[in-house]
């Protein structure tokens, strides 16, 4: 199973003409069935998608409906176990905490790949590998 980072979801809803290739790729990814998310990813999506400075900002209601639609995928809750593993991974791999939390949520879901444009492509974090799907 693959784990999608927030940027995959954000590209899927982008109306920016400069991001249309990435939007198509993101929607192709979301059409698959082998995908997992986390509560953190959905929270970040809400914050970024409704940001007033975003040219194509969603309303609260639109964002809630979008998040509900993404619940068709398995979603990893944030637990104290994941938080503690992320704190460990932060130290071990010298990652920002929020990136480590993504890696550890993916691991908890049994994912071997994290689809992300924000983390280092091809980097392996103890059996969880980052893949940039937009390269």
Regions found by a protein language model. Give the residues of each.
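Acidic, PIN/NYN-like endoribonuclease modules and their adjacent C-terminal/linker elements
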Residues: 1, 103-135
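Short, well-structured N-terminal submotif of metal-dependent ribonuclease cores
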Residues: 1-37, 52-61, 65
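Short amphipathic alpha-helical interaction patches enriched in hydrophobic/aromatic residues
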Residues: 10-14, 49-53, 71-74, 90
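Substrate-recognition element of Asp-dependent hydrolases with the DxDx(T/V) motif
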Residues: 37-40, 116
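Active-site neighborhoods of divalent-metal-dependent phosphate/nucleic-acid chemistry enzymes
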Residues: 72-114
């Amino acid at each position: 199973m693959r784990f999608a980072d927030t940027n995959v979801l954000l590209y899927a809803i982008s109306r920016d003409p400069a991001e249309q290739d990435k939007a198509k790729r993101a929607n192709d990814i979301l059409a698959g069935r082998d995908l997992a998310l986390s509560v953190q990813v959905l929270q970040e999506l809400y914050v970024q998608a409704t940001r007033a400075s975003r040219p194509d900002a969603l309303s609260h209601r639109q964002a809630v409906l979008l998040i509900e639609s993404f619940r068709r995928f398995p979603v990893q809750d944030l637990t104290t176990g994941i938080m503690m593993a992320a704190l460990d991974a932060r130290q071990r791999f010298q990652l920002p905490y929020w990136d480590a939390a993504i890696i550890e949520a993916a691991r908890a879901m049994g994912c071997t790949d994290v689809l992300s444009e924000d983390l280092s492509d091809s980097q392996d974090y103890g059996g969880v590998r980052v893949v940039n799907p937009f390269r």
